[in-house]
């Protein structure tokens, strides 16, 4: 994972949930030393729990069964004392205004987590750039970098570049 190259041994980061974020957490837990992952995802915490390279801090809150994440005001209380360099987030969709989510509570929780990070990095499959969500997550200007596959539509890449968002692609044939 190209996004894993941005994380160093001994670093503390935040990771929200989603398939790409889970793969990142697995890569870090397997191939980095002393990485602390702060997450609201019970799935990610459980998925990497036996890996010796990662220390997990699971943020508490209201549990959403389908996505296995914690949301709501308790997450805000839990995350308040932290500040990290990077927050890694997935997305459900994209439009000319930015990134989108399909769940209001989850979007609000992600924005709270983003307030405690110097940089926001999106990890997503390129197909999400052809889909929309029901609520706004971030304007693309609030996102430092996007990691996706090489199928990203050129219009989306141009919008991101115009907003000073770095776009990193990997071959979709991998």
Locations of the language-model features?
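Hydrophobic/small residue at the entry helix of a nucleotide-binding pocket
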Residues: 20
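N-terminal active-site wall of soluble small-molecule enzyme domains
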Residues: 23
């Amino acid at each position: 994972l190209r996004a894993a190259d941005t994380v160093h041994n001994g670093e503390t980061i935040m990771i929200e949930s989603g398939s790409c974020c889970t793969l990142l957490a697995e890569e870090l837990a397997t191939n980095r030393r002393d990485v602390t992952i702060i997450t609201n995802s019970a799935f990610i915490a459980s998925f990497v729990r036996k890996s010796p390279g990662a220390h997990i801090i699971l943020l508490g809150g209201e549990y959403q069964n389908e996505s296995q994440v914690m949301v709501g005001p308790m997450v805000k209380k839990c995350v308040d004392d932290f500040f990290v360099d990077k927050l890694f987030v997935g997305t459900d969709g994209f439009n000319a205004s930015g990134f989108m989510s399909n769940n209001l509570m989850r979007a609000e929780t992600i924005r709270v987590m983003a307030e405690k990070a110097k940089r926001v990095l999106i990890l997503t499959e390129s197909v999400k750039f052809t889909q929309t969500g029901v609520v706004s997550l971030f304007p693309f200007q609030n996102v430092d970098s996007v990691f996706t596959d090489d199928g990203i539509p050129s219009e989306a890449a141009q919008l991101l570049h115009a907003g000073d968002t770095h776009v990193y692609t990997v071959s979709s044939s991998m």
